[in-house]
Every structure is written in C-alpha cells, then in structure tokens.
Curated annotation (Swiss-Prot):
This is SWI/SNF complex component SNF12 homolog. It is found in: Nucleus. It comes from the Eukaryota. Coiled coil: none annotated. Residues 1-12 have a biased composition (Polar residues). Gene3D superfamilies: SWIB/MDM2 domain. The keyword Transcription applies. Pfam families: SWIB. The lineage of its organism: Eukaryota, Viridiplantae, Streptophyta, Embryophyta, Tracheophyta.
Length: 534
C-alpha cells in the first residue's frame, strides 16, 4: 500500500473500478488468488488516479464558474433581481441550493460526482463517462428555531423605530388576556355554586273534558268521552297573581321551566276505572328536555279523585331537619352548608364558644338534645348532624276529575317556595359561550401574523441587497461558498475532504487495508462481467 505514488498509468481503454462504494455493481472474482491480487492492485491504482483527476477537474470547474459569474455580474451592472429573496447571507438563515444567481443567469451547477449504476444492473458496452454521481443520501435536517408569529425580531426593531409601539401593544394585549383568563376562571367557579333567591312557584291543577253529553247508543262512529288532567305552574313576579290557569301567560324565559323543579311526578288514577295502567310516573332523569307542564288524557265519563305526588328537585340537595334540630334553628328544610352555618350563628349569638379552646363550643340544653354532649368540636358538627337529616317529604295533592260544570274545571292552586338562580347567571353562561367564539379576534391575529411574515421577508431582502451593495466581490464569494456547502449537504458529501483524498497519505491509514478486504468480500462470487469491467 506504500507504492501509490509510483503507480504506472493504466491504458485509456480500460474501465475504472469503483472503490469503497457498496452501491456499485462489481465484477466476479476469478478463482486464481494471485491473479485476483494483481488485478486488485492494478484497479486500485487506476481508481486512485481517477479520483485525483476528478478532484482536479472539479476544482478547475468551480473556479471557472466563479470567474464566469463575476464577469456576467459586471456586464449586467450588479443586478440581483432573481436572488432578492435568498436566505443564507448576512445571518439570514440557511441558504437554498436552488437559488438562481442575479440577472437570471441560466447556468447549471457542476455536479460533484458522476452517475453510477445501481447494484445488480447489467454492464453497459458503451464508453463509461469519467464523471459519476454518487447515490444521494438524505442529510439530517436541523431544527430551526421557530419565533413567535406575532413578535418582531430585534433586527427589525432596530430598522423600524415605530415597532416600539407595536411591542407595547403586544404587552398590553398579554395583560388583557391574563385578566380575561382570571375573570373567566372566577365566573366558572361562581357557576358551580350559583347564588339563588327564593321565589314562589304557583302550581295549578285542573282538568278539561269533551264529548261527555254526546254519547248516542248504537253509534260506533261517535267520539268517545274523554278528560284531560293538566299540571302547570309559574313563578310569581313580586307576588302578583297571574291570570286564570286555563289562560296562563307564557312563562318568563329567564326562569327555569316548570318540570326542572321536580325530580319525579307520580299520578295515581282510580284502579277500579283504569285497572290496566293506574299509575303514571314521570322522571326528570329520563326526560330529554324540561317541560312547561304535564298533561294526562284518558277516556272516561265517570268522576273520581286522582292522587298527585311531587318530589322536589333541589339543587344543591336539601334535607329535612329532625324535630330537635328544627327547634334549635327554626328551619324545616335546608341545604347542609346552610344548616352548619346556622349552627355557627347560633353558637356565636349565645357566646357558647369555649374561651380556652376556640375549636370547641359548649352545648346548651337545646344543643345537648341534638348532639348529646356538653362540649363539641366544630369539625365534628357535620358528622353529628347526619342522623338528624333526612330527604324532604314529597308534596301530596289530590284533585277530583270533574266532568260537568265549568270547562276547564278549576280545583285549586298551590304555592311552593323554590330556589331560582339570579337572572345574571344566564348572562354569565352566555358570556362564557361567546368568549370561546372569537372568530373576529382570530381573523385579526391572522392578518397581523401575515404582516409580520411580510416584514421579516422584506428585512431579509434588505439585508441581501445591502450586503451586495457594500462589498459585491466578497458577497458573491460568500454566496458561492454557501451554495457549494448546500450542494454537498444535499449530495451527502458534507463529511468528505477532497483535499485530503488527493494525497497518498490518506490511503496509508490503517483502515484502508480492512476497507479493501471488505470491498472484495462484498463482490459476488460469479457474474457476467469480466475482470476490469463494471
């Protein structure tokens, strides 16, 4: 391997063998080992000479391209129409290998490697070109740091003094967004436990009837007698009595619908008259949407009494207090937090808090009936009152189905205290819903981002032309060097050093012998190609 500098010249007609490229098709190795070694030495010498000639030709071609480019630039007056958007100069980012030179120069870039045959391809009888391109290998992409789309770079801020106002607007926008986010969170927390006010729900129970006096014996086509039971209600506005139940005005849309106040409604009919289906049950959990009222229609011409059972739907859940706890607090049905708060106010009003340990309070006679202890810790109140709380009893109503007289037949109306959320709750819900639909803001942001991208593009173009105007020669040299580096990266030759490969010391390294053996072992044992051919 030490006699590479004294290799004899190979005849011109012989074809060179590829060296160190596993992607090339190779000829078969003859059975004579001595012939194989001599053949390898001859081909290796030819390959080395070819690599040296190729490197020299490439260097000469590159210098020729550079000289021709400078001459044409001078002839065209240094115009850069085609290269105005090129990055890669003056810290403008990585350059593109497809950049055209100024003045629309129709000049092809010199390829660094000649074409080559893929493995297994048949050998060609034509004269092989001394220039061959290597297989393209994808280069690893560098992650480009993505700048915020709405922010301006410091380079742009230095060029445009007016950008300081835009930066101030961005800071103000961030403060507004932070404030809106905090308010949105506060509204969401408030909606979880909405404040309510007590109002009176007036429930109307009445029935109407039809075809009760038109029954003609022996006429099967006559309409049968029917009756209809209706249960409706509405929230009283400041105690004002609404109109007659048969002509109840439309409910206030700000208030919940009638069925939302009930968990379950059960109507029991006379089992003697309606043995098949005497029980009608409506459940809020199975109802797809709240209703303004309930209506039951049946056939019949006999009057009877219907039983109505209404189970209230309290949100949050309410409990009925025991007699002992009711005597202490003076309330009958209430939520657990309000019951605990009422006990706390009772203790504070009577100064029952233990002065030595404020976490305890002393029980008077009324509290001793409830808790059964003389002293109790505040944290134990919630646990102690559990057996004094029970589900509130349902509302039982009875209505007589009348089939004569006034139609509809009004029986009675009933007032029930219910919790109605503040009307502002609906406005808060609408506010949260509208806050998510910011299409106009998104459109403005998109327009701002497009303007920012255009500003950055113009800054790159300005830097490109400014660098060319200040030093045209150095600028063009840097441009050519950048494009050459990009071409090497695309061709997968970024790690090669052509200058080192020109010297014989490069092939005297320890790895060369192992590379030659690996190359020979990779060649097929037999083939159609003869020695010295592709």
């Amino acid at each position: 391997m030490s006699g590479n500098n004294n290799n004899p010249q190979k005849p011109q007609g012989s074809a060179p063998l590829p060296f160190g490229n596993p992607g090339m098709a190779s000829a078969s190795v003859p059975g004579n080992q001595g012939f194989a070694q001599s053949h390898m030495a001859a081909n290796f010498q030819a390959q080395f000479q070819f690599s040296q000639a190729q490197a020299l030709a490439h260097a000469q071609a590159q210098s020729k391209v550079q000289a021709q480019l400078q001459a044409q630039l001078q002839a065209q007056g240094m115009t850069m129409n085609q290269a105005q958007g090129s990055p890669g100069i003056g810290g403008l980012g990585p350059s593109s290998p497809s950049l055209t030179t100024p003045g629309s120069l129709n000049m092809k870039r010199f390829q660094q490697k000649p074409p080559m045959r893929p493995p297994g391809a048949p050998a060609s009888n034509n004269t092989i070109s001394p220039m061959r391109t290597m297989e393209l290998t994808p280069a690893a992409r560098k992650k480009k740091q993505k700048l915020p789309e709405k922010s301006l770079q410091e380079r742009v801020a230095a060029i445009l003094p007016e950008s300081a106002l835009y930066t101030q607007l961005l800071e103000f926008e961030s403060r507004v967004d932070a404030a809106l986010t905090r308010k949105k969170v506060d509204i969401q927390e408030a909606l979880k436990n909405p404040p309510c006010i007590q109002k009176t729900l007036r429930i109307y129970v009445f029935n109407s009837f039809a075809n009760q006096n038109n029954t003609i014996p022996g006429n099967p086509n006559a309409d049968p007698p029917t009756w209809t039971l209706k249960i409706i209600g509405r929230i009283l506005e400041d105690g004002v009595d609404p109109d007659q139940p048969g002509f109840v005005q439309k409910a206030n849309p700000l208030h919940p619908k009638f069925s939302s106040f009930f968990k379950r409604v059960t109507v029991s009919l006379d089992q003697r008259l309606y043995p098949e289906n005497p029980l009608i049950i409506w459940e809020n959990a199975r109802s797809p949407a709240p209703q303004e009222g309930f209506e039951i229609k049946r056939k019949g011409n006999q009057e009877f009494a219907a039983s109505i059972r209404l189970e209230m739907n309290y949100v949050p859940e309410k409990f009925k207090l025991s007699t002992a706890l009711m005597d202490v607090l003076g309330i009958e049905v209430e939520t657990r937090p309000r019951i605990i708060a009422a006990i706390w106010h009772y203790v504070k009003a009577r100064k029952l808090q233990n002065p030595n340990d404020p976490s305890f309070f002393n029980c008077d006679a009324a509290l001793q009936k409830v808790f059964g202890e003389e002293k109790l810790k505040f944290t134990m109140v919630s646990q102690k009152i559990s057996h004094h709380l029970s589900p509130p009893p349902p509302i039982h109503l009875e209505h007589k189905i009348k089939l004569s007289g006034n139609n509809p037949a009004v029986s009675a109306c009933y007032d029930v205290l219910v919790d109605v959320p503040f009307p502002i709750q609906r406005d808060l819900n609408n506010l949260l819903a509208n806050a998510e639909k910011n299409k106009e803001i998104e459109a403005c942001d998109e327009a701002i981002c497009a303007a920012i991208r255009k500003i950055h593009e113009h800054r790159r173009r300005r830097a490109f032309f400014l660098g060319f105007s200040q030093s045209p020669v150095e600028f063009i040299n840097a441009l050519i060097e950048s494009q050459s580096k990009d071409l090497k990266v695309v061709a997968g030759e970024a790690s090669r050093n052509a200058e080192r490969e020109r010297r014989s010391d490069f092939f005297n390294q320890p790895w060369v012998e192992d590379a030659v053996i690996r190359y020979l072992n990779r060649r097929p044992a037999a083939g159609n190609d003869g020695p010295g051919s592709w």
